[in-house]
């Protein structure tokens, strides 16, 4: 595995590759990341993994500062996976002329997390666009854990006629049901138990929600009783259009954002 921080050096190694896969990350690797990387390796001739904590996508400075990262630990976790290139750029490598404030993304940005995190998805689309322009991968691998983000990037790539294929990968969960996430390291043991109970509550009531045997407000009240003080939203939506499903099918998900102390 070659570890590269300069984009020009990376380009020298990869510019001839025709079947290049790319996994963008912000580090703090867990089994979810490793699953993305393994899938990329299995489908592509060469694999590039990046670690870059994208400052512009954070709405609060303190969230950026406390984001967990340990490069040495991350390298150890993937060194035996047959990754070809690990790209570790700094802020100037990615934003030599500053951020693009005029980037246009789909109306999906106004829903769910976009309503509460202004500019977040524009910043995500901007950095993904910059990475694609540098690496020019045939495929880019993103997790379905961040479903709204995945749909926005899919739409952005299609709208801008970018040749890279976006591959959505299944969510990997811990034994307690929680999706593997770098943010989980910020939770206490008791908070993880609450998060696990919420996941199980949603799974148990998913069919009842779509059939309207139980309301979202009833679920919201149950979650509040578990000790959650703030819920930004809870919705059941078609996963492709992010609208309320108009017919009974399996093409929907429950979307929720809530806080456990200061962790969202």
Where are these regions (language model features)?
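Nucleotidyltransferase catalytic core that binds NTPs
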Residues: 1-230, 237, 241-252, 262-264
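Short beta-strand elements
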Residues: 256-260
């Amino acid at each position: 595995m070659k570890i590269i921080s300069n984009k020009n050096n990376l380009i020298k190694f990869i510019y001839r590759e025709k079947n290049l896969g790319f996994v963008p990350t912000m580090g703090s690797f867990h089994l979810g990341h490793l699953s993305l990387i393994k899938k990329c390796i299995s489908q592509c001739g060469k694999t590039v993994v990046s670690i870059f904590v994208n400052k512009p996508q954070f709405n609060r400075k303190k969230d950026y500062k406390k984001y967990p990262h340990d490069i040495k630990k991350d390298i150890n976790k993937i060194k035996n996976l047959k990754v070809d290139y690990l790209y570790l750029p700094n802020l100037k490598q990615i934003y030599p002329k500053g951020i693009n404030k005029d980037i246009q993304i789909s109306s999906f940005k106004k829903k769910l997390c976009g309503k509460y995190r202004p500019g977040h998805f524009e910043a995500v689309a901007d950095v993904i666009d910059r990475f694609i322009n540098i690496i020019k991968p045939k495929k880019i691998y993103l997790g379905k854990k961040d479903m709204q983000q995945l749909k926005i990037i899919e739409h952005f790539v299609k709208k801008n006629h970018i040749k890279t294929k976006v591959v959505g990968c299944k969510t990997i969960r811990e034994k307690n049901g929680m999706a593997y996430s770098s943010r989980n390291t910020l939770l206490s043991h008791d908070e993880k138990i609450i998060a696990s109970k919420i996941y199980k509550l949603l799974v148990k009531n998913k069919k009842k929600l779509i059939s309207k045997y139980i309301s979202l407000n009833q679920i919201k009240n149950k979650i509040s009783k578990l000790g959650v003080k703030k819920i930004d939203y809870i919705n059941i939506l078609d996963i492709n259009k992010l609208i309320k499903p108009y017919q009974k099918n399996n093409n929907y998900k429950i979307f929720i954002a809530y806080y456990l102390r200061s962790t969202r």
